[in-house]
């Protein structure tokens, strides 16, 4: 077996997602399983180079996980010819410039979304990457959730007949930070720092809708700030200038209507933190992070509206759980594996910087729709 060491500059791994999902659950998990077998006698061995601004935090991570390489100097890391891939999980406002430098240095790019703070910047990154001839990918983790993989299986199997509509509910109560610490970083709630639920979640909804149901043709959204003041990591009050909730209606190719509510100011009365209900002529499904329930046309009850008597049906009990039928790996790790196969075995991979730009576009148009109070068409973008 030929073991090939792959050095990956990982910028932003001291943050919640960068650390938990990308470093621990993806790259270190790949090392724990002995590397990634490409199937041709080559096993890829990922060697992370932890990059960030705070040396003490990087050192603590390296010691905790027995890793050798850390750096607070991105330029030096990018100048190192042994580093193949640049990964970015920084705050959005710092991402664009860093990715440009990495492309100029000839590194393959794998990045969190949103790829840039605006569509022009996102398209420029895609163009630069294409012209440089490098491989590039954008994290689209929701597609790899067990619940959505089951939903895709239902779609591919023709379960729904003609799909009519999609309803999504996402969110939970993020504490304000005064009497209980907030479970999300304070920059998420400051527009000037790249915060806001639209720029965070609409890129996710773009690829979920696009991949499963059809391209988004129009958006009509209301974005608002329900909680105008929050308290930061040091217990200091600050003005929440970014939107913390967004209510969107999306028209898709083929006439499917999607309606998705996203909120950090909602209390959860559903089985999971995100749920999508899909209704079709032949059946319906409700998919979350892990689970998926269905109701077929032949088993659909026939309720009659009568407010004078208690409900005779326990409606939730009339849905059937979709079995796993397979083992599901961590979604971030699954996508890392696909990207590494793309880079080193030329395997197909279409979640690239152009796909990332579509997500930025939808967020931008969603905010424009909210500001102008109107429905906005979503034009197709190309390089």
Where do the PLM segments sit?
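Beta-strand-loop-alpha-helix segment that lines the small-molecule cofactor/substrate pocket
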Residues: 84-85, 91-92, 96-143, 158
